[in-house]
Amino acid sequence: MSKKIVPVPKEDTPPVPRRSFMKRSVFALTAWAMLGAGVISAPAWAELGEPEKEDLKFGFIKLTDMAPLAIAYEKGFFEDEGLYVKLEAQANWKVLLDGVIDGQLDGAHMLAGQPLAATIGFGTKAHIVTPFSMDLNGNGITVSNEVWKQIKPNIPKLPDGRPKHPIGAEHLKPVVEKFKAKGKPFKMGMVFPVSTHNYELRYWLAAGGLHPGYYAPHKGDTSGTLQADVLLSVTPPPQMPATLEAGTIHGYCVGEPWNQQAVFKGIGVPVITDYQIWKDNPEKVFGMTRAFTEKYPNTTVRIVKALIRAGKWLDENNNRNRPEAVKILAQSNYVGADYEVIANSMTGTFEFEKGDKREIPDFNVFFRHFATYPYYSDAVWYLTQMRRWGQIAEYKLDSWYMEVAKKVYRPDIYRKAAEELIAEGKMKTADFPDFDKESGFRPPQTEFIDGKVFDGTKPNSYLEQFPIGLKGKEKI
């Protein structure tokens, strides 16, 4: 494979490292030697060819959960696959999605709802797929200091005087009612209409008896504020703290480091993490067009191989590598926040009120609990939330949810990548689900803040459990 001339990267783009042609040549010769010696089996090497496209550009938003991309790049995992990648920060989630759809980006760190929404035509219509889930958990809900002062006295206390967690939205309800009595709207920010953050914030509010509003796309209303007690609006993640400080919103749901930034700046208090709303919830995915995966199948598998290795590196040995990862993420071309701010959540702790730092070892999970496997049930949960809040305007059969999940989530590609890594000796069989027995549906999940049970094989029954939200054949 020939060495290519690399263009000078633009500002805020990670510098392209020297391409280790010699390293890859030696690796290939070693592999063939192992093959001849019978150490590895022929099919693993014969089936996966060279990448059809070597030079790639991936997009991301400045959040700590873009870490698998940064680590795959910095640790040479992409290069090991013969891939020469540029990582480019994007202004917001819409710009990122449009970049993937129009081919300016070959793939991207995406909100899990984006490939699903695009495929069913909520917003921009395009068939986007994901063969890789990037992480579990990683978000929080923060309120302004003014709001915190009003809700804190009503929260039960631990023996040491700290607030008892998790803090439900029922404690926010009296504050919202005061705003309403004065004729003022209570406003909160989230990052995108089909973001986990939107659905987690809505879930938390509704569990506490506050209506977060409906969408009515069939009526031309995509505000998401119909019948709302709390008005939710979109703000790009890095702008959340400044928007809160300006008083434009009274709280927000966002990924890190933007909750911890509010703590460090003294402008707000995180009240709950998404781990406390739904333990080990699926968060971001790596998305690309279906057309890309069909045109460049070997490249696609090799991308997933590199990302799997990055996820494993981030979690191995009880997060031993996290401090190094934080140092990388703190660079301006990645997240660009202070080391201490990123470390506050990436290294197993999370700070709520200033000084109230608590152990949450699984606040960010990049590989444990089969975090990287693209489960169909994860896709179904997102689709149920789209239906619950009106983004899917009409009743759909359970079979429809399954069909969409299987169009978008691609465990077949993931399995191919995993089996290659096992054959190469880079990973173990135990690192992955049992592919021969795996249905793609997690067992029913029970650890939600409201005690509800989610069975991905029964989406309509799941929706029937909620007093707030659309269900059955209800329409706006």
PLM regions: where:
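N-terminal secretory signal peptides
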Residues: 1-20, 31-38, 43
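Conserved C-terminal helix/tail region of periplasmic/extracytoplasmic solute-binding proteins
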Residues: 380-476
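Sec-dependent signal peptide recognition
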Residues: 24-28
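Short glycine- and hydrophobic/aromatic-rich loop-to-beta-strand nucleating segment
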Residues: 141-142, 285-288, 292-293
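Secondary-structure end/capping motifs
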Residues: 294-412
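Short, glycine-/small- and polar/acidic-enriched structural segments
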Residues: 47-233, 245-280
